[in-house]
A protein has these predicted regions:
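Intrinsically disordered, charged low-complexity linkers and terminal tails
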Residues: 1-200
Length: 200
């Protein structure tokens, strides 16, 4: 899935539709692991007209991903703003610092009597006080969305979230400002819609 820049569900649907044929399949209870050789990956990439994603395209890919503005919930925006705020000179940010900002964003909304997010969001006063639950939630979504596309990585041993070195080395001051501006603008638009939908 990561080779093709799509999610696992897309790969599974392609296999069911006969567009891909894995060389090996391993069953683990209700789950199945599909394996492809590098040659097969390239063959299907050409057959399906899938663009190659590598270090040379990663910055373009990153901004294209942000431009999609795929926000089923607000998570990506406060998460990325927190990462940018704490990222150091080698592209690392301590997960604890990111998490503190992430929690603080939602706690501030509760304190001000504003909706935390859409009704499907589980964040409430109780959950926001449970740092372990919040870290699990943040690493599942939104972090995993960035990890799947190889923009960010998490080192449990070092307790840091790191930006892909190839991407970090291409990011200039103007790029960071561009990301920050988009996230702030997208947050404002997102919550204008959420608050507009709230019945007072």
């Amino acid at each position: 899935a990561r080779e093709y820049f799509v999610n696992t569900g897309t790969i599974t649907s392609w296999i069911r539709a006969g567009k891909l044929t894995p060389e090996v399949q391993y069953k683990f209870g209700s789950k199945t692991l599909y394996l492809f050789s590098p040659d097969e990956v390239e063959k299907y990439r050409k057959q399906l007209g899938i663009k190659e994603h590598n270090d040379a395209t990663i910055k373009e890919d990153f901004f294209a991903f942000l431009e999609e503005r795929d926000y089923s919930l607000s998570y990506k925006m406060p998460f990325l703003l927190a990462f940018i705020r704490h990222v150091d000179s080698i592209g690392d940010a301590k997960i604890e610092e990111i998490l503190e900002d992430y929690i603080a964003f939602y706690q501030d909304r509760i304190t001000r009597g504003l909706p935390v997010d859409r009704s499907t969001c589980p964040y409430n006063e109780t959950m926001l006080q449970d740092k372990k639950a919040m870290q699990r939630s943040m690493l599942t979504n939104p972090f995993e969305k960035f990890e799947r596309k190889r923009f960010l990585y998490y080192s449990k041993d070092l307790s840091v979230i790191s930006m892909n070195h190839a991407l970090y080395s291409q990011m200039e001051a103007g790029d960071w400002k561009r990301v920050r501006r988009q996230m702030e603008e997208d947050l404002a638009e997102y919550y204008a819609k959420v608050e507009g939908a709230v019945v007072v």
